[in-house]
């Protein structure tokens, strides 16, 4: 092959030697640079693999996390990722990590990245959308991460029926911890997914709607406005709310 005419796939890739094969022992990981891209290199169960170096939740450096078997746990909030596939396996966080090719040759470890994906730090798992002719309906009561993860998991496992998420919040699922970290946040900065995302994957989000009763015999729920909604399967994921218990002091000797 002419050395000046490389295959298009090779032209789009960047490969660099990042370390010696003996630099990492089994169960160890380190950050390496491929071009200007930080990559997490992992040696697990006798095999090298490479994934994105930052958690898809709040961008924490995963090299400071914990590696157990084929899973690395984020040091900030405990999100877990598979070091072989990059898939997220435990919340918090919704997105998976990019993966990179690894080759061990003559005692050296090489990592290959796609030049067009150098700026990508996370990815969405492949999902299907809704087929209108399928009438089967799964109703999710609650607008938090649990309901959203359920909806996405259904689409990732090729469920093509109707998905309805009902929440009394004014917004679709959003990142509530951010509310305690800054004032005057822009609405779009706290949403877990955009409106386009829900439309693309056929996930209906009904905001400012409240379910007040469930009829499991007829498989229907009653809304606060008196309307009824039928379902085939139901998930209640409304979370919990702190209930404060007050103790009043009767005398100076009593404790509050």
Where are these regions (language model features)?
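Hydrophobic structural packing positions in well-ordered secondary structure
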Residues: 24, 55, 102, 151-154, ...
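FAD-binding core/adjacent interface of flavoenzyme oxidoreductases
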Residues: 75, 84-108, 112-139, 191-256
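Short amphipathic alpha-helical segments
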Residues: 67, 86, 151-153, 177-178, ...
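Short cysteine clusters
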Residues: 55, 74-77
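N-terminal pre-ligand scaffold of iron-sulfur
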Residues: 1-69, 103-114
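Short boundary motifs at domain starts and secondary-structure transition points
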Residues: 6-9, 127-132, 154
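Beta1-alpha1 glycine-rich phosphate/pyrophosphate-binding loop at the start
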Residues: 133-204
């Amino acid at each position: 092959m002419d050395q000046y005419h490389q295959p298009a796939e090779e032209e789009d890739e960047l490969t660099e030697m990042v370390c010696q094969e003996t630099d990492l022992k089994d169960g160890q990981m380190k950050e390496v640079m491929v071009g200007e891209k930080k990559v997490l290199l992992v040696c697990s169960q006798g095999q090298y693999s490479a994934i994105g170096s930052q958690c898809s939740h709040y961008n924490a450096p995963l090299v400071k996390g914990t590696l157990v078997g084929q899973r690395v746990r984020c040091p900030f909030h405990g999100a877990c990722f598979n070091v072989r596939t990059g898939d997220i396996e435990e919340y918090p966080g919704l997105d998976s990590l990019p993966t990179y090719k690894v080759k061990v040759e003559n005692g050296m470890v090489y990592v290959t990245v796609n030049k067009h994906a150098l700026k990508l730090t996370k990815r969405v798992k492949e999902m299907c959308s809704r087929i209108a002719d399928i009438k089967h309906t799964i109703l999710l009561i609650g607008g938090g991460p649990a309901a959203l993860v359920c909806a996405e998991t259904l689409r990732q496992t090729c469920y093509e029926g109707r998905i309805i998420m009902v929440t009394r919040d004014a917004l679709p699922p959003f990142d509530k911890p951010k509310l305690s970290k800054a004032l005057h946040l822009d609405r779009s900065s706290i949403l877990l997914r955009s409106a386009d995302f829900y439309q693309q994957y056929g996930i209906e989000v009904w905001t400012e709607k409240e379910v007040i009763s469930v009829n499991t015999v007829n498989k229907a729920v009653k809304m606060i406005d008196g309307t009824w909604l039928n379902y085939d399967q139901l998930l209640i994921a409304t979370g919990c709310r702190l209930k404060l218990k007050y103790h009043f002091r009767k005398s100076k000797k009593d404790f509050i």
